[in-house]
Amino acid sequence: MTRINSYPLPLIVDSTVIFNFGIVGKFCVLEKLYGKQIIIPTDVKLEISTSPVVGPLIDDKIKEGTFEEYTINYECSNREIKDYIYLKKRFGNGESACLAISKNWKCTIATDDMTAAKKYCEKNNISLIGTLGILYQAYRECIINKNEGQAILDDMINIREYKSPTNDFDDIITWFEKHEGQELF
């Protein structure tokens, strides 16, 4: 297992993050940051498949081998299956799959559910990153500059209608570099 900036890989990605980057045509940011270590649970893929824009993009990324699809089934560990079934009582199928996989593989979940999922991650020592954390990583790794980060954030808010806790990329930089301002993920 490799790590990027203390986030153990692979990255298990929930639909919110996929939609945020997919709708604005910025899967390239995820690819440059995480290479071929992006896992899309089948339950998440099913949620995304209803989108006429992002559904086909995900299918293409899986066919290319850029993203990997993973199904929780009888071949998985008993613990992973039990966690998944338990989590489905509290979360949707996609988020349950992401949480169960991340917990059992000891890797990172990418989600923007900063309430119940965040609490579950904290309780179970699961590494968590959200859309804003990914944008900051891309900035820090010089994949995007500050102006590009602001433009991507603006597109996510205006096109995707992403309910970001901030609309200013400077706030993102300030939080992740100085831990000042509103807590972001």
Model-found features: residue ranges?
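Acidic beta-strand-to-loop metal/phosphate-binding motif
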Residues: 109-112
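Active-site-proximal, substrate-binding regions of enzyme catalytic domains
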Residues: 2-107, 118, 166-185
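Acidic, PIN/NYN-like endoribonuclease modules and their adjacent C-terminal/linker elements
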Residues: 117-185
